[in-house]
Amino acid sequence: MYKRQVLTGTPIRQELLNGNREAGRQFCGFTADKPVLMIIGGSLGAASVNDHVRKILPELLKDFQVIHLCGKGKMDEKLTGTAGYVQYEYIKDELPDLFALADVVISRAGANAICEISALHKPNLLIPLSANASRGDQILNARSFEKQGYSMVLEEEEITDQKLLDTIHKLYQERHSLSLIHI
């Protein structure tokens, strides 16, 4: 290494590291009696993930409160006001507080998303974009994190409503065993 060089990783927005769990709870109107599942569809949303989540929402709400970042134009107005469920197209200022509130996270496997989730030590389920819809980089990212014990992975082509529900419950039950917690 040369004296004037610095080796870095992916830049992380520092404000994400300073979230306040109670501020997040207040923003969402959630109670402290159930764990919080945060679903991030990316800036464009993840239509198939959104659809599956909405189909299993009644089952999810038995055990979780759900924050659903569904992407621009992807909100389902019929679900507005559902107890224990909030949906947003996009969140900026409150995002650190929502991350602090989340017990487990479901996300795509883009490089920035997984680096932020890693920095926050959040147990996570990654649903990478399919090889048909991408360069395949998200699949490689997700499998790398899974192999190291940092994440659980569910391929988009393999998702069924029941499989997603079962995997979410497994993620929560095994959240302390994911080695990401210990990074």
Model regions: which residues?
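Short hydrophobic beta-strand element within catalytic cores of glycosyltransferases
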Residues: 107, 123-135
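Donor-nucleotide binding loops and adjacent catalytic segments primarily
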Residues: 21-23, 30-105, 139-143, 147, ...
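Active-site-proximal region of nucleotide-activated glycan assembly enzymes
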Residues: 3-22, 27-30
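Short beta->alpha connector loops at strand-helix junctions that form conserved
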Residues: 8-10, 127-130, 154-158
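Conserved small/polar residues in nucleotide/adenosyl-binding loops
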Residues: 1-5, 181-183
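Short, hydrophobic alpha-helical segments
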Residues: 168-176
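Short acidic/histidine- and often glycine-rich active-site loop of Leloir-type glycosyltransferases
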Residues: 7, 116-119, 135-148
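Acidic donor-binding loop of glycosyltransferase active sites
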Residues: 88, 100-115, 122-123
